[in-house]
Amino acid sequence: MHAPSEIRLTFNQDRPQSNEDDGSGLAVQEAKPILQAPPMYKVVLFNDDYTPMDFVVEVLETFFSLNRELATKIMLTVHTEGRAVCGLFTRDIAETKAMQVNQYARESQHPLLCEIEKDG
């Protein structure tokens, strides 16, 4: 018959193996850091006396994927209150959208201004 073989399980691969058992048999896992949501930024459109309302609606539909009704509502807010929030995004996305809107407005020879503001 065969002699019984000894099976040794190692739970912690980080420590070097030794022939002596310390009795713990447990691996210690480091605590994971608590993740926080990134700060959000508002993309804001400002009113001017020269940009046509239809162009503002087009910008809102194109760059913010808004439907015609919501785009028109935001455009009217820009027109009557002087400014309106188009969306809330992380910083990189907000900066990119504002840059794209400003570039498109300049290429179309309109003075429409779009900026970002930290939310909160």
UniProtKB/Swiss-Prot annotation:
Residues 1-27 are annotated as: Disordered. This is ATP-dependent Clp protease adapter protein ClpS. Transmembrane segments: none annotated. HAMAP family: ClpS. Binds to the N-terminal domain of the chaperone ClpA. GO terms for biological process: protein catabolic process; proteolysis. The gene is clpS. Involved in the modulation of the specificity of the ClpAP-mediated ATP-dependent protein degradation. Belongs to the ClpS family. SUPFAM superfamilies: ClpS-like.
